[in-house]
């Protein structure tokens, strides 16, 4: 059986539209660059789709495994407690989702964190500001 990857891009959410737009655009960029991957965006609060709704969006796609990645810079309560609770993750950051009547393994990725790519982007924004 061929593996089909799903990616759940998790955003914080906001009452203002820009947070949803940024996370959704990042999810779209991933989907455009990796056309063989099914990408969905979901949000913790104040934005839709919720995480549960985004997970339901994998129905009918044939995904055989899902990676959930928080589009956050650093760990906090949402990353360490709330999201793992919503996704019913074990202590290793793994879980099982039922999609189309099948058990689909889910793995939880780290937040973006300190990375040279982030540093390059920060420097790019500085150059744009000057």
Curated annotation (Swiss-Prot):
One of its GO terms (biological process) is anaerobic cobalamin biosynthetic process. It is an enzyme of class 4 (lyase). It comes from the Archaea. One of its GO terms (molecular function) is nickel cation binding. The keyword Cell inner membrane does not apply. Pathway: Cofactor biosynthesis; adenosylcobalamin biosynthesis; cob(II)yrinate a,c-diamide from sirohydrochlorin (anaerobic route): step 1/10. PANTHER family: SIROHYDROCHLORIN FERROCHELATASE, CHLOROPLASTIC. This is Sirohydrochlorin cobaltochelatase. It comes from Methanosarcina acetivorans (strain ATCC 35395 / DSM 2834 / JCM 12185 / C2A).
